[in-house]
Regions:
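Basic/polar N-terminal segments that are highly enriched at the extreme N-terminus
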Residues: 1-4, 141
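Short acidic-aromatic low-complexity motifs
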Residues: 3-27
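A generic structural signal for ordered secondary structure
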Residues: 8-12, 32, 92-96
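Short histidine/acidic/glycine/proline-rich micro-motifs that form metal-
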Residues: 11, 38-40, 83-84
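A solvent-exposed, acidic/Ser-Thr-rich amphipathic alpha-helical stretch
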Residues: 26-74
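A beta-strand edge to alpha-helix "cap/lid" segment located at domain peripheries
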Residues: 56, 62, 70-141
Length: 141
């Protein structure tokens, strides 16, 4: 596994914009599988559409890769996404599990993050319901 390749992929995420989404083609297999709490897709064009959609619908999104580790054909990234919503800057932290194929291209990218605590509880109606459910179900220790 090429260390420079991984660092270049991380650098792309850290500087991601509408102007450089097409650079993913340098890193991903044309049949990449991508999954996160909202999407399950296959193919490099669909992978890039996820990010075009993000920049269209999310105000000022950015990623910071906090650290990474690698093992054989896998890379794990710990990251923080920042964006503006609900009149303030919001943050979501998550992990990405990235698998490389025998050609060294990324053929699987799975994002793990908590959509309930990271996003949904900040929505007015859902946040109120969530707070009420915590009063019922959360243990008082």
């Amino acid at each position: 596994m090429n260390e420079t390749y991984i660092k270049d992929y991380i650098n792309l995420f850290s500087h991601l914009s509408l102007n450089n989404i097409e650079q993913f083609d340098n890193f991903i297999d044309k049949n990449i599988i991508f999954s996160d709490p909202f999407n399950d897709i296959k193919g490099s064009e669909n992978f890039k559409k996820i990010f075009y959609h993000m920049f269209k619908n999310v105000k000022d999104p950015s990623f910071i890769v906090l650290n990474y580790s690698k093992s054989e054909n896998k890379v794990f990234l710990k990251w923080k996404m920042a964006f503006y919503a609900f009149r303030s800057k919001q943050f979501i932290e998550g992990l990405s599990e990235i698998t490389l194929n025998s050609d060294g291209k990324i053929n699987c990218h799975i994002d793990y993050w908590d959509s309930m605590n990271g996003l949904f509880i900040k929505l007015p109606f859902i946040g109120i319901l969530y707070a009420l459910s915590l009063k019922i179900f959360k243990a008082k220790i």
